[in-house]
Amino acid sequence: MANKRMFNLSVIDTDAFLEMPLSTQALYFHLNMRADDDGFVGSPKIICRTVGASEDDLKLLIAKRFIILFEDGVIVIKHWRMHNTLSVNRYKETNYTEDKALLKIKQNKAYTLDNGQPLNDAKYIEIGKRQTIDEQKTNKRRTQIR
């Protein structure tokens, strides 16, 4: 798990986010900081208690669809891929692979359980100078063709 996390203003600077209580907003930031490299948090209730948030704050994040709750109690940050992009040499896949297998990804990089493309890490994990794994393979093929 990294020590640095990013936040995308297109998610944070919305009425849906800013109209939530400050305690709920703070919980969202704390959950993001403690998430693994795929955006999963295995102990959201412990984090709630640790930071002084209530379970109502957690329920509000679920209701407003900022986080997705799985049956086993694990959560994932819905907009994780919008917020963060990791290089392949720093990326460590989540331990929650069964939950991850249920996810799809929308065109805007938000996780979903419904409609979307199957999750393909090669498109979202960066290699080197801001290239994804897929982009690197494409560029390599172009170089070989020439």
Predicted regions and their residues:
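Winged-helix/helix-turn-helix nucleic-acid-interaction surface
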Residues: M1-V11, A16, V51-R146
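Short, amphipathic alpha-helical interface elements at domain boundaries
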Residues: A2-D38
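Short N-terminal amphipathic alpha-helix/helix-capping patch enriched in small hydrophobics
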Residues: S23-L27, S43, D57
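Short acidic, hydrophobic short linear motifs in intrinsically disordered regions
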Residues: A35-V51
